[in-house]
Regions:
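Conserved C-terminal helix/tail region of periplasmic/extracytoplasmic solute-binding proteins
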Residues: 40, 174, 180, 255-260, ...
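Hinge/lid segment of periplasmic solute-binding proteins
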Residues: 113-165, 221, 303-305, 370-375, ...
Length: 432
């Protein structure tokens, strides 16, 4: 799964995409001649049947790539005369995709998350969804669909996701006689537990604070305290990024590191939070589903729970998501839609065992919303109703540089209020 906000495209790349897309005036294709349930197409009659090649670009490698290749083969079996060419771009995904769009030779279907950068080169899917009820759009979680919209249009369908939860070591809790956390716990409960679970002689800590945290992930704590980094319309940061509530949410982590009930991790010459949790040197660690299997393999007796809440305020979540989209310059849009639809169908989802299912029906069938380890991810998903900043302002990349510098300094113990005020002042020019 591509973690959202893990990479940002250069401004030149975004400009290139905008220019390229502006030259393309392709219209949405319909879904006439397609099966409503099997993901098959009905080829036009022809004396000579030629193989149609559909290109699918992915950022995945290894086992996840193998699964996607298997999905492609299944689609080919359902659609004789169709060849799905799976193109593994790996770490060069963005560069190769931009080059393909620039050459007007993009893959027909591709993994996607960065809709602010790529939307001008993508095919809006609203009309496809409207004309084709077999996609069962209401079977997707609404929060995931919200992350696939930009400027009022739907540019992708959800493929995989993770929310963030607290992983906790049951053995360490029990040894310290600290009650296991529950879904109604507060930040005061969290801080108390972290302090009790810290045993410095054993180099054991209650929690780990990332010294250079991703501001994207921090949004859920700010939202949960009733604020945000930017206004809902994306036009203001004064009174949002530097609000009392924002500073309070960020200060929690700085204070944990300051009183030594949390260890700073992930920075230069610092340890990995994941490694420490697997070694039972951390009692709690916030993370996504991607670490779950590695914790199992390390034989850690762990549980998961939703993030703590601020008093009298509902908890909020932020989503790391991957989606699939269609290129506006695709010459096989109808077939691309059928493949996209098959990829996010119940069958396609069940094949992608490394991803959390994105369809409500699959989750209920597998009873993941009742599984103690997986239920917190879905409860947090249902709380993920806010829109992340990068989808609200096209200049968020520039604004975020100033915010990130402030956040990193806050984690090192500097004053949150002063640093956030400076970040707002330095970023005002990007809002004009």
């Amino acid at each position: 799964m591509k973690k959202v906000a893990s990479k940002w495209m250069a401004a030149g790349m975004a400009l290139l995409l905008a220019v390229v897309a502006g030259c393309s005036q392709a219209q949405p294709a319909g879904t006439d001649g397609t099966s409503s349930s099997t993901g098959t197409t009905t080829p036009a009659s022809s004396d000579k049947k030629e193989t149609v090649t559909l290109r699918f670009a992915t950022w995945d490698t290894d086992q996840m790539l193998k699964i996607q290749q298997d999905i492609a083969k299944q689609f080919e079996q359902k659609n004789p005369g169709v060849k799905v060419q799976v193109e593994a771009y790996a770490d060069g995904f963005d560069q190769k995709l931009v080059a393909a769009f620039g050459a007007k030779n993009p893959p027909d279907v591709m993994y996607m998350w960065d809709f602010p950068t790529y939307n001008a080169s993508l095919e809006p899917l609203d009309e496809y969804v409207k004309k084709d009820p077999s996609v069962a759009i209401d079977d997707f979680y609404q929060g995931l669909l919200n992350y696939n919209r930009f400027d009022g249009k739907l540019f992708g369908l959800p493929a995989g996701f993770s929310t963030r939860v607290v992983f906790y070591n049951k053995k360490l809790f029990n040894e310290a006689n600290v009650p296991l956390p529950t879904d109604d716990w507060t930040w005061e409960d969290f801080k108390s537990a972290a302090k009790q679970l810290t045993v410095r002689d054993k180099k054991q800590y209650g929690f780990a604070v990332r010294s250079e945290p991703d501001t994207y992930d921090l949004q859920q704590f700010v939202w949960s305290n009733g604020s945000s980094f930017i206004s809902p319309d994306g036009k203001a940061i004064e009174g949002y990024m530097n609000s009392k509530e924002t500073a309070e949410a960020l200060q929690i982590f700085s204070d944990l590191a300051k009183d030594k009930s949390a260890l700073l991790v992930g920075g230069k010459n610092q340890q990995s939070g994941n490694d420490l949790f697997k070694a039972s040197k951390l009692a709690m660690y916030d993370n996504g589903v991607w670490s779950l299997e590695s914790y199992k393999k390390a034989n850690v007796d762990f549980g998961t729970v939703v993030m703590p809440q601020f008093p009298g305020k509902p908890g909020k979540g932020v989503i790391a998501t991957s989606s699939v989209s269609i290129a506006k310059d695709s010459k096989n849009k109808e077939l691309a839609w059928e493949f996209l639809k098959f990829f996010v169908s119940s069958d396609g989802i069940k094949m992608r065992t490394s991803d959390l299912p994105v369809r409500i029906s699959v989750v209920q069938e597998k009873k993941l919303d009742q599984d103690p380890l997986y239920a917190p991810f879905y409860k947090t998903l249902e709380q993920s109703t806010d829109t992340p900043a990068f989808l609200l302002n096209p200049h968020w990349n520039e604004i975020n540089r100033n915010l990130s510098a402030a956040v990193n300094a806050i984690m090192m113990g500097q004053n949150a209020e002063e640093l956030l005020n400076k970040a707002v002042k330095d970023s005002q020019k990007f809002l004009k």
